[in-house]
UniProtKB/Swiss-Prot annotation:
Family, per entry: Belongs to the ATPase epsilon chain family.
Alphabetized UniProt keyword annotations: ATP synthesis, Cell membrane, CF(1), Hydrogen ion transport, Ion transport, Membrane, Transport
InterPro entries noted in UniProt: ATP_synth_F1_dsu/esu, ATP_synth_F1_dsu/esu_N, ATPsynth_dsu/esu_N
Keyword Signal: no
Matching HAMAP family: ATP_synth_epsil_bac
Domain of life assignment: Bacteria
Record GO terms (molecular function): ATP binding; proton-transporting ATP synthase activity, rotational mechanism
Mode of membrane association: Peripheral membrane protein
GO cellular component, one term: proton-transporting ATP synthase complex
Stated name of the protein: ATP synthase epsilon chain
Function: Produces ATP from ADP in the presence of a proton gradient across the membrane.
A Pfam family annotated for this UniProt entry: ATP-synt_DE_N
Cell compartments where the protein resides: Cell membrane
C-alpha cells in the first residue's frame, strides 16, 4: 500500500472533505505546489484555483475548485480552510450563472442595507467560482 496523506478541507458552509490521498496540488500565494507524503511542514495562503488530488500514485488526478483560504501542511496531513470547495464535476455553471443573474436583479431592487450586503457577498462568491472555474 502506498504511503498516504490525510487531506481535510473545511469551509464556513460546513462543506467537509476528509480522505486519504497520495498527492494534493494547490495554488498558493507563492505559486503552485504538490504535496506528497512526508512533506515538510508548511503554512501558506491559497488563492482561487482548481486544485488536484490523486488518491494513489498511478491514478488520475481529480480536480476540485478551491477559493481563498489557508493550508497547513504537516508530515502526513494537509488541512485546508477555504471559503468554498467543490469537485469540478459537481459544479453546474449554468446554475451558477442563473443564480448570479438573479442575485444581481435582487440587489438592484433591494432597499435594506443589511440584505444588500448579504446579496453582494453571495454575488462575490459566485463570481469567484466562475473565475476560478474558467482558469482551470
Amino acid at each position: 500500500m502506498a504511503n498516504l496523506t490525510k487531506l481535510k478541507i473545511v469551509t464556513p458552509y460546513a462543506q467537509i472533505l476528509e480522505k486519504d490521498v497520495y498527492s494534493v496540488e494547490l495554488k498558493t500565494s507563492e505559486g503552485r505546489i504538490t504535496v506528497l507524503p512526508d512533506h515538510n511542514p508548511l503554512m501558506s495562503t491559497i488563492e482561487n484555483h482548481v486544485a488536484y488530488i490523486r488518491e494513489l500514485p498511478n491514478t488520475p488526478r481529480k480536480p476540485l475548485l478551491l477559493l481563498d483560504g489557508i493550508v497547513y501542511i504537516e508530515q502526513h496531513q494537509v488541512r485546508v480552510f477555504s471559503d468554498y470547495f467543490k469537485f469540478l464535476d459537481e459544479i453546474q455553471i449554468d446554475e451558477i450563472n442563473s443564480s448570479l443573474n438573479q442575485l444581481k436583479h435582487d440587489l438592484n431592487n433591494e432597499e435594506d442595507d443589511k440584505k444588500k450586503l448579504q446579496l453582494k457577498s453571495k454575488i462575490k462568491l459566485n463570481e469567484s467560482i466562475l473565475i476560478a472555474y474558467k482558469d482551470r
